[in-house]
UniProtKB/Swiss-Prot annotation:
Pfam family, one: CSD
Protein's recorded name: Cold shock protein CspA
Superkingdom of the source species: Bacteria
Coiled-coil boundaries: none
Protein location: Cytoplasm
Upregulating conditions: By cold shock.
Amino acid sequence: MNSGTVKWFNSTKGFGFIQPDDGATDVFVHASAVERAGMRSLVEGQKVTYDIVRDTKSGKSSADNLRAA
């Protein structure tokens, strides 16, 4: 499980980015992952833990299994 800070999240557009604590490249997060976690939204500066999953069709990575830290 990875940890990081929400860089920004736009609930109208349905996505945002998490800045990993380890300094890696920002991680995309989709609104569907937020909903699956039982959260309403994410706020800038919020600490979260997450897994990185790769879409088999597009090959792109995103955050999933979000939890407030």
